[in-house]
Amino acid sequence: MARLLVFLLTALPMMAWAEPVHLRIQGSNTLGSALLPVLIRAELRAEHATQVQVHSAKADNESVITATRADGVDVQVDIAAHGSSTGFDALARGEADLIAASRPISDSEARQLQAFGDLRSPAAEHVIGLDGVAILVNPANPLSELSLDQIAQVFSGQVRRWEQLGVAGGDIHLYARDERSGTFETFRSRVLAPKQVNLAPTARRFEAGDRLAAQVAVDRQAIGFTGLSTLHGTKVLAVADGTAAALLPERTLVASEVYPLSRRLFLYLPTPPSPQAAALIDFIQSPAGQAIVAEQGFVSQQIVAQRVAPVANMPAQYRALAEHAQRLSVNLRFQPGSAALDSKATQDVQRVIEYLNQAGKPHRKAVLVAFGDPKDTPGRAALLSRLRGEAVRQALARGGIEVLEVAGLGDQMPVAGNEMEQGRLRNRRVEVWVY
């Protein structure tokens, strides 16, 4: 009996240690249909796992990944990619360890899920890449650009014929993502809600972006929207916000979130965190993980320096930077109504620190240029923008970076209209330039 007891006492911890690891990911189709399976396979292989396999599940837009870790433990990762909202719903039911979302958590969701921690905290909210909601038409369509106002008129049904937009084509056929999609929520909040209109009931709805794009590619009268990884032979229109120039969703413009329909791609890690989920996030945020994000058609957060062509109407200080320095491919933004960095900027500051150290430019080689939105009091916009720049300077200083200068340019050079709060938030930004 004593020997049996000793055996059980020693064997039970080993049995527990060898228990299979099971990770459940639910939410965004944009993330879960292709990107996450590739990232998970890469993370498992980086940890020297063997027999890494992807299996199709019984339902559409679901998959199962299995592997055996180097320590002999079996791993199973279940992915259900039915839309961002379904991920938060699954967490509420206790059916998810990690939430994939192509839009930020809403106020009501954050309140409902308080039992799982502050899901807006940097420890829980992880931006793993960027994307743009692209406006798609058939390749035969001669149209090249639309404003956000025009897009709202089209998708609400106020504009129903292509002739109303200056091109031939007859009736407009609308294609949209479904209600549970984070892509649709981004489109609704950025395009429809500011004009207080709803999606026309005639729109055809799709759970998956690749299927939507495939239909637009064969319908000469079509217009739709989807993420950058599922364009599939369609024509992408440039988008204008207010009086700003129309922009295509080019990688540099999405990386800096200047493109009007740029969006962040999130993973939400609830409390208590799953160790397997936390390890996956760490891998995705690494250079190897971010390289995969870019390979899969999204925009990574790896920082690069780029030249900006000087333009005559630039502020003199800004034009001098364009002539002699390079701008980094990141804009640092803030929590609403605050000079505190948002969750993405908190991560990006560390990337800027790493970039400047690796480039051999930690001391007095960086200039911060801060912008804001218009204020009633003269000079207040410039003051507030400088305060935001100082907040970034202090964050960089904690990482050993000595900034050469902080410039507050106030409400100059807006990248969005200031009529709506979301536009004002986009204009409150800090750029990093390097000599």
Placement of each model-derived feature along the sequence:
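N-terminal segment of the mature folded domain
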Residues: 19-155
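Extracytoplasmic ligand-binding site segments that recognize negatively charged/polar headgroups
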Residues: 34-36, 121-203, 207, 213-217, ...
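Ligand-binding pocket segment of bilobal, Venus flytrap-like solute-binding proteins
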Residues: 58-71, 88, 180-247
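Periplasmic-binding protein-like
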Residues: 117-137, 145, 147-167, 233-269, 283-304
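Pro/Ala/Gly-rich low-complexity, hydrophilic intrinsically disordered segments
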Residues: 293-326
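Periplasmic peptidoglycan-binding/anchoring modules of Gram-negative envelope and division proteins
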Residues: 317-322, 327, 333-369, 393-398, ...
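Periplasmic OmpA-like peptidoglycan-binding domain that tethers envelope proteins to the cell wall
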Residues: 361-362, 371-435
